[in-house]
Amino acid sequence: MSGRNMELHRNGTAPEAMKVIGINGSARKDGNTTIIVGKVFDELNKEGIETELIQLADYEIQPCRGCFACKGRGNCVFTNDGFAEIFNRMVMADGIILGSPVYSADVSAKMKAFLERGGVVVATNPGLLRHKVGAAVAAVRRGGGMTTVDTMNHFMLNKEMIVVGSTYWNMVYGKNIGDVLSDDEGMANMRNLGENMAWLIKRLKD
């Protein structure tokens, strides 16, 4: 571990471990969304922040049933899919990156179902995600990127999270896997987003 990452807090104690999870809503596990989330992760790792990528493609995510049985329980009562496990990891993390490709001018169906489930859980159990640092990123071929980013940002803002910005909208352009690497401006924006996210998480921990 570098000397920078071994710095003590002002009170002389060693800093707590910091962790960010990324949730990829793409059906393509190794596609462009994974690439751009990975670029943000690179900057977080440089600052000693642990990262973990969660692929929604690995899980069944059912839509919200609107039963409100989650009230007072801190999580969804239905545990026959992947939602409850992933949501627990969100609650334990310091930061959360939501990533999605653009499908029909919005987030993917799995990401939408995940956000709807999470939205009700937090609404009926206020404060579960309060003051966690969040960022939304989208892999886009042509149109719909702003709507996609807005959908994820609205979830985070409505749940009392602190949303990080960058030098431009958090979208990177590309159709085929790997095309996003040719979007120099978009990838630079992801690097800056990672730097800003690391800075904020460390300040909140200080």
Model-derived features with residue positions:
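Short, glycine/serine-rich, charged loops/turns that create anion-binding
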Residues: 27-28, 58, 141
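Glycine-rich phosphate/pyrophosphate-binding loop and the adjoining helix
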Residues: 4, 11-21, 46-47, 79, ...
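Generic structural signal for helix capping and beta-alpha/helix-loop junctions
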Residues: 30, 61-63, 107, 173
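N-terminal beta1-alpha1 ligand-phosphate binding loop
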Residues: 18-49
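Helix-loop-strand module that forms the ligand-binding subsite of alpha/beta enzymes
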Residues: 75-168
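N-terminal beta-loop-helix "entrance" segment that forms/cooperates
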Residues: 56-75, 175-182
